[in-house]
């Protein structure tokens, strides 16, 4: 009977001393309860997302120093510790010429490292280095594949099972690092190679150990269970999966780590699972290879998507960790009365005391009494600070100033008969550029020039602001003037309340509602915003904190008479349909290959075949949303152009967001600012449809 423990610690990226102390506390506890094997996550000393800090040799040296201290902690005990850390080879270089580094897994026992005499290093080297989405491990690490090729060895010789001594006798583990278990689309299968290598030597593996740094996304735990359950049955071996909690970021995307460490028996059953987002050490007994799964009880209603409770926990946990990490104590939220600001306020209210939360309503003449009352109700229900700061006067002042101050067009000075000596290296410089260069260097450059001055008089023009320009001024006045000013006054920060649907097509104003220190719901689709609001009222608050009116009112920016919510006027989006369409653009669908995002050609061909409802997962036929093929095509082209147009520039300048989906904006989705592209097949399909309608 082996007692193992999951060291599901909170990992602070780049903070070696703090992570070391967390590990030592876990080690002390594991010793106190007579643990045989304590398992920590991947790169638990350094953190996974530390950017190019990996290039700094002193940082690497400190990683190795603390790793040695962990090894020493096993001296004079019966405790074996498995932990992730960087490994190096001082005599070799990475492909970029930097110090050779490995994403490594160490096994320590009796004060020293446990290794296989046939392995080249006293640690296990990660083989599959992900280089997709926001992952880019080959930037810093060398894989076991390269080591095998350098040494002219089979990959199976590089990483092998390890046998440790326990109070119950010899115990053999197969150490695996994160992606090395997710090998479906790779040519190499590290776990299979290790198991087959053991069989070839008549060696029995008692436990497969996967140490991961695996961030939360919607449905991620279901995917983990499916993978490890299948592998446990395939290899007829229990699997211990260990992950950490905390948040880490690459600047634009903030990853939330949920932990959810788990033990799987040979039947693939989940026999132990550490609760999500808990910084804890969880001991468990591995008595034999077969366990009985424990029953679970669901509190969800049929109308609540199954992932919503965990999504709420992830966002709440992310907010708490991000505020602690940045030291921000006071939060300012623009409360419009709509659902987005209401949900954001509700989320922050579960983390902050009410005295640290400021809700600000900033009405103009276009805001209805209904939404103003809803903003007031929200603040009253939360019990936080509330202020009303009308923007009409400020907006009118800005508009009046912009339309009353003239622009003067000066006459253009032109040059003719220009003869100058241009060095060969400067042959590509345009004439206008060389004119400027020569005029500023008349004492050193030989040239002759005849100057002509345009005799036209100066002209004066005045700006005439469009309705759209005036709408954007309102949004910028709210964020850049009022919210930023209040945040500065209370020594806090103001939020961006945007959602993923809006970000997809740029339905937001730069330096306006797109501003803020963090977009908590920036990776949450609008329909899920509503689902989260209903869930929080029913299960978290158990009362109506988010006013029902904010859930029921038509979504609207209320920036003009054309967006009058009292007349049922609002956003130009049918969220039930457009969420499904935009998700296909950004993430793909459950019916496509991983990372296969759909184009207008895919959408239109499915429409032509009558399969679009199935492809997008629509709850109604397409005819419910559009009355004609023409209308459907115009809508598709409008939003595809928006998605690939100015919306890209807006997303580049948007605040950081929590990554919770299959594909988030930021570094998770690499984007260039290009002209919207329509495939040739799209034009052919479009012609057929329009001819036949």
Where are these regions (language model features)?
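ATP/NTP-dependent adenylation/nucleotidyl-transfer catalytic domains that generate, transfer
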Residues: 171, 236-237, 248, 266, ...
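Enzyme catalytic cores with a strong preference for nitrogen-chemistry domains
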Residues: 1-334, 344-356, 361, 370, ...
């Amino acid at each position: 009977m082996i007692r193992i423990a999951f060291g599901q610690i909170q990992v602070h990226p780049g903070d070696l001393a703090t992570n070391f102390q967390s590990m030592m506390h876990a080690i002390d506890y594991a010793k106190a309860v007579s643990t045989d094997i304590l398992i920590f996550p991947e790169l638990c000393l350094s953190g996974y997302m530390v950017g190019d800090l990996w290039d700094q040799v002193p940082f690497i040296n400190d990683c190795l120093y603390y790793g040695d201290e962990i090894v020493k902690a096993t001296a004079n005990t019966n405790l074996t510790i498995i932990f992730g850390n960087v490994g190096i080879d001082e005599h070799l270089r990475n492909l970029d010429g930097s110090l050779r580094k490995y994403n490594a897994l160490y096994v320590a026992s009796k004060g020293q490292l446990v290794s296989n005499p046939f392995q080249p290093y006293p640690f296990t080297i990660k083989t599959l280095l992900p280089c997709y989405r926001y992952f880019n491990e080959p930037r810093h690490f060398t894989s076991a594949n390269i080591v095998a090729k350098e040494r002219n060895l089979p990959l199976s010789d590089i990483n092998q099972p390890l046998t440790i001594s326990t109070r119950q006798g010899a115990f053999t583990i197969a150490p695996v690092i994160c992606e090395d278990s997710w090998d479906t689309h790779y040519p190499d299968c590290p776990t299979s190679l290790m198991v087959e290598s053991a069989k070839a030597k008549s060696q029995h593996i008692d436990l497969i150990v996967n140490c991961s740094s695996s961030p939360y996304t919607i449905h991620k735990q279901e995917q983990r269970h499916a993978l490890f359950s299948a592998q446990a049955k395939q290899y007829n071996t229990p699997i211990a999966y260990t992950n950490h909690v905390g948040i880490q970021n690459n600047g634009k995307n903030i990853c939330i780590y949920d932990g959810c460490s788990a033990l799987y028996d040979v039947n693939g059953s989940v026999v132990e699972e550490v609760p999500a987002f808990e910084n804890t050490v969880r001991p468990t007994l591995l008595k034999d290879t077969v366990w009985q799964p424990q029953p679970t009880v669901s509190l969800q209603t049929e109308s609540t998507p199954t992932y919503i409770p965990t999504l709420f926990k992830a966002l709440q946990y992310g907010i708490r960790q991000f505020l602690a990490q940045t030291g921000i104590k006071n939060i300012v939220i623009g409360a419009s009365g709509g659902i987005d600001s209401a949900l954001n306020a509700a989320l922050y209210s579960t983390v902050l005391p009410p005295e640290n939360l400021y809700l600000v309503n900033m009405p103009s003449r276009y805001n209805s009494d209904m939404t103003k009352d809803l903003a007031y109700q929200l603040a009253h229900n939360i019990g936080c600070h509330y202020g009303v700061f009308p923007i009409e006067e400020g907006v009118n002042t800005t508009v009046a100033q912009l339309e009353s101050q003239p622009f003067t067009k000066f006459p253009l000075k032109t040059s003719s008969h220009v003869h100058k000596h241009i060095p060969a290296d400067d042959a590509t410089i345009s004439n206008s550029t060389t004119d400027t260069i020569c005029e500023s260097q008349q004492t050193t450059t030989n040239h002759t020039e005849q100057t002509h001055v345009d005799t036209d008089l100066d002209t004066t023009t005045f700006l005439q602001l469009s309705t759209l320009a005036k709408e954007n001024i309102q949004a910028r006045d709210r964020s850049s003037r009022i919210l930023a000013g209040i945040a500065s006054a209370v020594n806090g920060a103001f939020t961006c309340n945007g959602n993923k649907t809006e970000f997809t097509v740029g339905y937001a104003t730069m330096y306006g509602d797109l501003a803020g220190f963090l977009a908590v719901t920036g990776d949450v689709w609008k329909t899920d915003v509503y689902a989260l609001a209903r869930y929080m009222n029913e299960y978290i608050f158990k009362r109506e904190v988010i006013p029902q009116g904010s859930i029921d009112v038509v979504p609207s920016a209320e920036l003009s008479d054309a967006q009058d919510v009292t007349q049922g006027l609002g956003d130009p989006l049918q969220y039930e349909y457009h969420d499904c369409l935009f998700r296909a653009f950004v993430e793909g669908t459950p019916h496509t290959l991983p990372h296969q995002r759909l184009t207008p050609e895919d959408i239109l061909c499915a429409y032509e075949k009558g399969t679009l409802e199935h492809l997008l997962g629509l709850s109604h036929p397409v005819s419910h949303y559009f009355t004609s093929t023409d209308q459907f095509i115009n809508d598709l082209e409008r939003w595809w152009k928006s998605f690939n147009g100015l919306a890209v520039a807006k997303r580049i300048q948007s605040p950081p967001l929590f990554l919770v989906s299959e594909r988030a904006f930021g570094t998770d989705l690499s984007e260039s600012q290009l002209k919207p592209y329509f495939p040739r097949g799209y034009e052919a399909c479009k012609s057929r449809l329009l001819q036949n309608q």
